[in-house]
Amino acid sequence: MEDILYRYNPWWEEKHTFESLIERPVPLERIRKHLRSGHIVFLTGLRRIGKTTLLKLLIKDLILKEQVKPEHICYISLDDYLLSKRNVLEIVEEYRKIHKLSFRQKVFLFLDEISYQKDYEIQLKNLYDLQTAKIYASSSSASILKTRKPYLTGRSVTIEILPLDFQEYLIFKQVKISRADSHLTDRYFEDFLKTGGLPEYVLRGDIEYLKELVDDIIYKDIVAFHNIKNPQLMKDYFLLLMERAGKIGSINKIANILKIAPDTAKRYLEMFADTYLFHLVSRCGKTNVTILAPKKVYAADLGVRTLYTGFRDIGSLFENYVYLKVKHLNPCYVYEEGSEIDFLTSGKTLIEVKYHSQMTKKQQDPSTLIRLKKG
């Protein structure tokens, strides 16, 4: 196992440059601010959203900025078959032996895809209680984290990683828009709405990559994990949700279309949300309204949505983008007397989304658009 650990941690043997990593300052800062807390930090989010890259960017900061000794940092990917017969405690013990580190010496542990480990929550509790370690862990499954995190109550925080926003997209594309070229903002922004914010897809533009990602989530993370007998039904459900992204999703209507029971439709919808393929937005109101009223459905990534529905209804795509920008403000939608307002944030800010043809001349001014897109 020693050889495997050295392969995952090249900074143990040489000065590592981390040259291939593209910076993501905003989500990285959200992760960094927990660096000196005692909490275990969980990174969650859609498959291939960049959780591994963010863990490695933090490792880079620890070595280059915080001056942490490289041997005090250990990264492992727990979906590696070669590590499948070892539990986390055994791996960490082996790591400490390699570098002659006692349990009292502080180390930084980066445990990628932690949910591949059976009883991971008990092992993390043991590490938390008995060793001096700062622990960062990642998972692409909200359902696994929700069912097992009670063991870690009071010991952990969860940070959801979202796709690249417009400014990050421009960085990944190596595009800088000067004031003189601000008229190009619209063009690049519409390209962004088509492409979405999955880092690897932004860099490569390979449609098969997106299709493979969706199939992996549907058939591995949902069908196989939940032992669903009709895989095609889940693919049909996915396509239906993509068509209805940005709209209020009536469970009864969905159930009728798919010819399944409403309870089954509701349960399957929650499975999609737990894999971060879709986000659900509740209606504003008293608790009974929030629970019982149908939810609005938004795609987790604009590129995935465009792939399966085409580049049409740009206003709806823009609304989806705005939702992703304000998701951290826990928005709900307002529906009163037949009228709807797109979002009411936790800070009591009402947001009605409009795009171009719906906007006034002043709102269409490029400087206004740039401020909005910088968000």
Predicted regions and their residues:
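P-loop (Walker A) phosphate-binding loop of NTP-binding proteins
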Residues: 46
